[in-house]
Regions:
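Short, glycine-rich, amphipathic interfacial segments at transmembrane boundaries or analogous
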Residues: 1-15
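P-loop NTP-binding module
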Residues: 4-6, 19-196
Length: 196
């Protein structure tokens, strides 16, 4: 359980190297649980999604990725919520990003990698230009699978921030490339009976 953090700006990470407050310790516990579930080194792609908007999945994606990177692991987080680009704010929302790579405007994904200002081991692949056709871009048979395969060779961990599963098909498309799916559920936003 990650406690609510009302005073954190959208673009800043709450996780800090030497901070032992409740939110930092909660992310360390989550990091340990994710490592336990993933098991071996070949499994490293974690998709983060939710059932509905406003659950805090982008906050969880960014801070969990940052927490893992604090262990001197090379980590990348992909903003594949191509409709909202919330996670891209930690990279100051560059003009070029994944949408531009998927539609062929950018030839190599390495051109759009943005280093986090808060953590030198954390890279971000932002959305870039907001596309009119996000689902169609993700359905492309080469860009996403080829990029994920290359990222597996470059990074120790890959976190993918996806839109909520109950709203659009995007998370279902991306899930086949993930080794693990982490569902974020915000207290008071979803009825407990829907979790079964």
């Amino acid at each position: 359980e990650i406690p609510e953090q009302p005073n954190v700006e959208d673009k800043h990470l709450a996780v800090e190297q030497d901070n032992r407050n409740l939110i930092n310790e909660s992310f360390r516990v989550l990091r340990t649980n994710v490592d336990f579930i993933l098991g071996n080194d070949s499994k490293k792609v974690v998709m983060v999604t939710s059932m509905n908007q406003g659950s805090g999945k982008s906050f969880i994606s960014a801070n969990l990725a940052s927490c893992v990177a604090l262990r001197d692991k090379k980590v990348v987080v992909l903003d594949l919520d191509l409709r909202r680009a919330t996670l891209s704010k930690i990279a100051d929302s560059p003009k070029l990003g994944l949408a531009d790579y998927f539609n062929g405007k950018v030839k190599n994904w390495k051109e759009i990698v943005t280093r986090s200002e808060d953590n030198e081991n954390l890279d971000v692949l932002p959305v870039g230009t907001m596309p009119p056709n996000p689902t169609e871009l993700l359905l492309n048979k080469t860009y996403l699978p080829d990029m994920i395969a290359e990222l597996r060779n470059e990074y120790d961990y890959i976190f993918i921030d996806c839109p909520p599963v109950d709203i659009v098909a995007d998370a279902g498309i991306v899930s086949k490339y993930a080794d693990m799916t982490l569902f974020v559920i915000r207290a008071g936003l979803m009825e407990k009976s829907l979790l079964h």
